[in-house]
Amino acid sequence: MADTDDIIDYESDDLTEYEDDEEEEEDGESLETSDIDPKSSYKIVESASTHIEDAHSNLKHIGNHISALKRRYTRRISLFEIAGIIAESYNLLQRGRLPLVSEFSDETMKQNMLHVIIQEIEEGSCPIVIEKNGELLSVNDFDKDGLKFHLDYIIKIWKLQKRY
């Protein structure tokens, strides 16, 4: 039993010393010497939400700019795409599709199919639709200057090969 009393006394002595240390620390530190700044030095920032909104609007602006570039790029036709349109149109004309030209007559049916296809494309009545950047586009959706440039190039090649 005597041992138990010693343990209790020992524990109670430590507690009082610990409490004394806390009191000394509280008395020794003031707000001026503390690591924590006083509340008066804190700045209330009201513009934090505006910074977030500005960043969000900036991202939205960048997204709109990318979409505009993508739309402009989509409107440019490549030589590969125009060759695909011509090939598909030729294939459908061979399978019996009627030419969609403004002056359709018996003479049109006697013309070379390549002439009919080029006439359809130049008039904008070619029924072939291609998918580019997730959009379905007809010949009318593309840049007219680029389309004309590629058609002229293809026609020159056909003339050299004596097909046109």
UniProtKB/Swiss-Prot annotation:
Chain positions covered by the region annotation Disordered: 1-39
Coiled coil location: none
Annotated keywords: DNA-directed RNA polymerase, Early protein, Nucleotidyltransferase, Transcription, Transferase, Virion
InterPro entries (UniProt xref): DNA-dir_RNA_Pol_19kDa_poxvir, RPB6/omega-like_sf
Signal peptide (UniProt feature, chain positions): none
Family statement: Belongs to the poxviridae DNA-directed RNA polymerase 19 kDa subunit family.
Functional note: Part of the DNA-dependent RNA polymerase which catalyzes the transcription of viral DNA into RNA using the four ribonucleoside triphosphates as substrates. Responsible for the transcription of early, intermediate and late genes. DNA-dependent RNA polymerase associates with the early transcription factor (ETF), itself composed of OPG118 and OPG133, thereby allowing the early genes transcription. Late transcription, and probably also intermediate transcription, require newly synthesized RNA polymerase.
Protein name: DNA-directed RNA polymerase 19 kDa subunit
